[in-house]
Amino acid sequence: AQCHEEYYFQKGTNYLAFPMDEGNTVEDIERYYDKIKFTDYTHALSRAPMLKAQHPGYTLFMHGTHGMRGLSCADCHMPYKAEGGVKFSDHQITSPLAHIERTCQVCHRESADKLRGYVYERQRKVNEIRTRVEAELAKAHIEAKFAWDKGATDNEMKETLQDLRSGQWRWDYAVASHGASFHATDEVMRILAS
């Protein structure tokens, strides 16, 4: 998966580290970060110690229908083509929807329009939930700032800040992969709902 994977830079080094010691679900990775007390930044309003998801596309893909069935990225994003009697993988990496006859329809027998509609409907459902979560997170950060401004103590805010960290992390993890609304629709909706 190379760069389509969740990673972070260890503080004080230029080396990538992969937070999968606890497993490869969003909860496992969060637990890893919490265990090592890792923080990417402190939120300006809420003061929550935040995590920033990088590119968890492959990690999420592995929890989706195609990943669990052993497909690779190249199966859909670099479909086979033939030129001059030679069959090879197309290195013009693109959306599988651009060449449905060489991607989706290799396995699925539905029409191109039906398959395209299926993808767009999955994306629509995830985006609907994502939009609601974004609004709630924004309100929560503003409410935390209000509490700080009214004199809340670190001890009083501890649980709230952890909830903000967790909620923002899960939202970010779900949306930072870009293609997860199709690659792992059910997993992304589960993450956004948690």
For the regions a protein language model found, what residue spans apply to each?
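Primarily the internal scaffold of c-type cytochrome electron-transfer domains
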Residues: A1-D75, P79-A193
